[in-house]
Amino acid sequence: MSGVQKPITLLVYLSTYQLVNLLTTPSTNTFAFMHYTLKKSLGQHFLKDENVCRKIISALGKQKFERLLEIGPGGGALTKFLLNIDGIDFKAIELDEEKVNYLSRAYPELNGKLIHEDFLEACAPFEQEFIIIGNFPYNISSQILFKILEWKEKVPAVIGMFQKEVAQRIISKPNSKS
């Protein structure tokens, strides 16, 4: 093996104003999935606008992949789109038992694909290369990225939404204040 490491592509859909607006303002394009509680301790925030989900899914369409892992599917906003992608091996990992129960009921096609586990403690769910997607929990976004770096040989791309401050740190130059 050569000493050259493959770079990980990180595609981030980021719009703090839009996210705040989506979380606080009713819309005709919102999901009706709030059959459970948001847990601040888990950094939970859920997408409610299908247009934002479509933009994240659109970024996924620019990648070639056979396996896909969704981190923290929550209420299934992205999951419902991901389940419609043909010809891939899809899995989702969710820590919150309440969300796992909801997802299992709402999306029976997740049977055998939903992992009830803490992502930060999980082993790679695939032996081969896979893409990671998600609307990442705010309070552990950095830890998620460090965990993904442990799998850097298997993960060529990460696509999703991060909190603005986390995204700014990701793209900042070394030794900068960000």
Where in the sequence are the language-model features?
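Short intrinsically disordered, low-complexity coil segments enriched in acidic
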Residues: 1-4, 92
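Polybasic, lysine-rich low-complexity intrinsically disordered segments
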Residues: 6-7, 29
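Catalytic cores of RNA-modifying enzymes
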Residues: 25-178
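Intrinsic disorder
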Residues: 2, 10-17, 22-23
